Amino acid sequence: MKLCLTFLLVLMILASVTGEKLSEQTLRRAARKNKGPRCWVGRVHCTYHKDCCPSVCCFKGRCKPQSWGCWSGPT
């Protein structure tokens, strides 16, 4: 029984010394930062609808919400 508890204690100490928890936090932070390209409505100059995010379209050279009435020109 004492040997088992000692073994568990050693494993816990090794996990804290090797920075296992730190690396998990680092991976979580990196995953939060890497969300892919961001699209800005109204700021992006566009020529075609595909130049904008899926939820917006190209309207008069700018990416605008689809509620503005996207024209059915080049996609």
From Swiss-Prot:
Alphabetized GO MF terms: sodium channel regulator activity; toxin activity
InterPro entries (alphabetical): Conotoxin-I_CS, Toxin_19
Disulphide-bonded residues: 39-53, 46-58, 52-63, 57-70
Propiece residue ranges: 20-34
Signal peptide start-end: 1-19
Subcellular location: Secreted
An example Gene Ontology CC term for this record: extracellular region
UniProt note on tissues of expression: Expressed by the venom duct.
Transport recorded as keyword: no
Pfam families to which the protein is assigned, alphabetical: Toxin_19 (PF08088)
Keywords (A to Z) from UniProt: Cleavage on pair of basic residues, Disulfide bond, Ion channel impairing toxin, Neurotoxin, Secreted, Signal, Toxin, Voltage-gated sodium channel impairing toxin
Entry text on domains: The cysteine framework is XI (C-C-CC-CC-C-C).
The family this protein is said to belong to: Belongs to the conotoxin I1 superfamily.
Role played: Iota-conotoxins bind to voltage-gated sodium channels (Nav) and act as agonists by shifting the voltage-dependence of activation to more hyperpolarized levels. Produces general excitatory symptoms.
Name of the featured protein: Iota-conotoxin-like R11.3
Native source organism of the sequence: Conus radiatus (Rayed cone)
